[in-house]
Design a protein with these regions (language model features):
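C-terminal active-site rim and adjoining tail of enzyme catalytic domains
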Residues: 126-202
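Catalytic beta/alpha-barrel core
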Residues: 65-67, 82, 86-159
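Well-ordered, non-membrane alpha-helical segments in soluble/globular domains
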Residues: 46-49, 77-92, 158-161, 190-198
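Glycine-rich phosphate-binding "P-loop"
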Residues: 60-82, 94, 183-184
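Second-shell loop/turn segments in exported
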Residues: 38-42, 69-77, 101
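Short, solvent-exposed loop/turn segments at secondary-structure junctions
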Residues: 10-11, 69-71, 111, 132, ...
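A structural motif corresponding to the C-terminal end of an alpha-helix
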Residues: 51-61, 93-98, 167
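An active-site metal/cofactor-coordinating segment within enzyme catalytic domains
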Residues: 1-58, 66-67, 136-137
Length: 202
C-alpha cells in the first residue's frame, strides 16, 4: 500500500471525487484532482506522504496526528495497530526514520510512553500541558524535556503562568490551537482581534 496525504477519511471535500480514501487503490486515487476553497478543480494531485516528507526534509516540521487514537467507533485493536504502524515507520530502519523533522501529537502520557518505550526516540512529542498535574507527570517521566513541545490548549491562561515559566526554564516551546475558534470569525479585523486576545491572554 502507498500512504497519501489526506486530512479527511473521504475525498469528497478536497477533491473532485467521492467516497472513502481506503476504498480507492493508489492508481485510482491518482486520477483525482484537488479542488480549491471555492470548489474549483485544480491540476494538482493527492501527494504521497513520502513525496511530502522529501519535499519538506530539513525545512518543515511535520506534525503527525494519529487520528485513530480518538476517533469514535475505532476498536482498541485498530488503535493499537495504528500505533504499532507508526512505531515501525519511526524506529531505526523504518520508512520515516531518516526524517528528523517529525513531531508526534499525542493524547496522553501513556501514548507518549508507548512510543518512547518502543524505541521511538528521534521525534518531538507534542503533548498537552495545561495544568500543574500535567507538568509534574511529564517532569517525572523518562522522556527528556528536549523531546517535548507543550500544547497549552486554546489560549494562554494567566493562571498557569507558573507552569509556563517552568516550561520555559526547561527550554520547552509552547503552542496553542486556534482551530475551531477564532479562525471562524468572518471579518478579518475582528478575526485578528480574536487571535490576539487568545494568544496574548488579554
Amino acid at each position: 500500500s502507498v500512504m497519501v496525504l489526506m486530512h479527511d477519511l473521504t475525498v469528497d471535500r478536497t477533491t473532485n471525487g467521492k467516497g472513502k480514501v481506503e476504498d480507492y487503490t493508489f492508481e485510482e486515487i491518482q486520477r483525482l484532482n484537488l479542488v480549491d476553497r471555492a470548489g474549483n478543480v485544480t491540476p494538482y494531485k493527492i501527494p504521497t506522504l513520502k513525496s511530502i516528507l522529501e519535499w519538506g526534509k530539513d525545512k518543515v516540521v511535520f506534525n503527525f496526528d494519529n487520528k485513530y487514537i480518538n476517533t469514535k467507533g475505532v476498536s482498541p485493536e485498530v488503535k493499537k495497530a495504528s500505533l504499532d504502524y507508526y512505531i515501525r515507520q519511526l524506529r531505526p530502519g523504518g520508512d520515516w526514520s531518516m526524517y528528523h523533522n517529525i513531531m508526534l501529537s499525542v493524547r496522553s502520557l501513556d501514548e507518549a510512553l508507548y512510543y518512547w518505550n518502543n524505541n521511538v526516540r528521534d521525534v518531538m512529542f507534542c503533548v498537552e500541558i495545561s495544568s500543574e498535574e500535567h507538568f509534574e507527570a511529564y517532569d517525572k517521566c523518562p522522556i527528556p524535556w528536549d523531546h517535548i513541545m507543550a500544547y497549552v490548549r486554546m489560549a494562554v491562561n494567566p493562571e498557569l503562568s507558573d507552569v509556563y515559566r517552568k516550561l520555559h526554564d526547561r527550554g520547552v516551546m509552547i503552542m496553542t490551537s486556534i482551530t475551531g475558534s477564532s479562525d471562524k470569525v468572518k471579518n478579518a479585523k475582528d478575526r485578528r482581534v480574536a487571535y490576539e486576545r487568545e494568544l496574548l491572554a488579554e
